[in-house]
Structures are given as structure tokens and as C-alpha cells.
């Protein structure tokens, strides 16, 4: 009864914690002839993390003076994390939102050019402590959950760490609409019993074969691009 599972999926923390612990006990039980297999999983996948694009502002050490990115000061500064929800696509910080966010910013002095306070950006682990966590609820509201799922698969190989960037999500949404329109026309389900052409059957079976192979290999990003 006790045999290996088909697939084990875990991140880097699992590889140095849970996985190490569980493999130790599997080897131990195998050496005692209590289980029939040496490894408890047929396939191991360490999925990469979705990284966040953090935002920082420069603060003069020991003061409440903050400087926009393009302003160079001959003073010692340190970078402070700020919430990415206050930063627009041009890396401009909403100072009013920042002042209302935490007491330390309420009476601080912010120096910028042309009334545009530019933040520093850096890709790092997505974490609440770094204020770079993206809430998917807004994406689901704007584009739907299917678009979010498909876009995540399309970001890249499952094993690689990937920075979160929604720049291409509108293209994924458009693809799903086109796919939907293949079977729905003017609000009605559109399927007929006409015999498909040889070319259509060739494309169909080629696509089925590609997707089946990619799913078995967990190459979900290339499976999506096959469409």
C-alpha cells in the first residue's frame, strides 16, 4: 500500500526543510525493508517564486528628509520600503497616500523635481514586510479568474522564479475572448455537425498532442503558447 506519490511540488523552503525530513524517513524505512521504494515521489518539481517589484524611497539618515530618485545629495541616505500600491506605472509616488499610511511620513519633508517624487525599484521576494504583495482580486474583477490563471502559466517555466508584471495581461484576456468566440456567436453556442477539413483535423490533433506532452512535462507556459 505504501508506495511513491506521482508528483511532489514544493519551493526552495521545502527542499531544505520538509523534503529533507520526509526523504530521511523514507530512506530509513526503506533500509528496514518496511517500504518497497527508496524515494517516496516519482517526480519532484521545485517551483519558482513569483517575485515582487519593490518600491523604495531615500531617507537622509537621522532625519525626516526624503529625496526623489533623480535628486543626488551629498548626504548619507538609506532606502525605505514603501507600499507598491502608492506607486503608478511611471514610478511616481502618491505622497498624500504615503502620509496617511504611516505616522513617520505624516510630517516628513519630501524633495522632488517638478512635483514628481520618483521611487527606486528592485525585484525581490514577494513579502508583506517588503510591501510588494499584489492582491489578485482587482485582476479578477477586471479580467476574470481564468485570465489570471492563464497569465500565471504563461509567465515562464514552473521551476524558474519570475517577477510579477501585468503588462501583458490584456493580451491574455484578448486571447480568451477570441477562444470563446470560436464556440459562441452572437450570444449563442455555435457548434455544427459539418465534417471538418483535413487541415482542421491536422491542426486539432497536433495541438492536442502538444498540450498533452506539455502537461505531462509540466511545461505549462509552452502549452499555452501552442494556441
Map each language-model feature to its residues:
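Gly/Thr-rich phosphate-binding loop signature of adenosyl cofactor/nucleotide-binding cores
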Residues: 198
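NTP/phosphate- and nucleic-acid-binding module
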Residues: 190-194
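Structured secondary-structure scaffolds
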Residues: 1-189, 203-226
Amino acid at each position: 500500500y505504501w508506495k511513491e506519490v506521482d508528483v511532489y511540488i514544493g519551493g526552495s523552503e521545502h527542499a531544505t526543510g520538509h523534503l529533507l525530513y520526509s526523504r530521511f524517513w523514507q530512506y530509513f524505512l526503506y533500509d528496514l525493508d518496511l517500504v518497497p521504494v527508496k524515494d517516496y515521489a516519482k517526480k519532484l518539481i521545485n517551483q519558482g517564486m513569483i517575485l515582487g517589484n519593490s518600491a523604495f524611497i531615500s531617507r537622509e539618515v537621522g532625519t525626516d528628509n526624503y529625496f526623489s530618485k533623480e535628486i543626488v545629495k551629498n548626504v548619507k541616505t538609506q532606502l525605505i520600503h514603501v507600499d507598491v500600491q502608492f506607486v503608478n506605472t511611471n514610478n511616481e509616488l502618491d505622497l498624500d497616500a504615503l502620509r496617511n499610511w504611516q505616522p513617520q511620513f505624516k510630517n516628513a519633508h519630501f524633495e522632488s523635481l517638478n512635483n514628481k517624487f520618483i521611487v527606486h525599484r528592485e525585484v525581490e521576494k514577494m513579502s508583506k514586510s517588503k510591501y510588494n504583495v499584489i492582491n489578485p482580486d482587482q485582476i479578477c474583477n477586471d479580467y476574470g479568474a481564468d485570465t489570471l490563471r492563464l497569465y500565471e502559466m504563461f509567465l515562464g517555466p514552473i521551476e524558474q522564479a519570475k517577477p510579477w508584471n501585468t503588462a501583458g495581461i490584456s493580451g491574455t484576456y484578448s486571447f480568451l475572448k477570441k477562444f470563446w468566440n470560436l464556440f459562441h456567436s452572437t450570444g449563442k453556442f455555435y457548434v455544427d455537425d459539418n465534417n471538418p477539413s483535413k487541415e482542421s483535423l491536422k491542426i486539432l490533433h497536433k495541438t492536442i498532442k502538444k498540450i498533452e506532452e506539455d502537461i505531462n512535462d509540466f511545461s505549462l507556459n509552452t502549452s499555452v503558447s501552442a494556441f
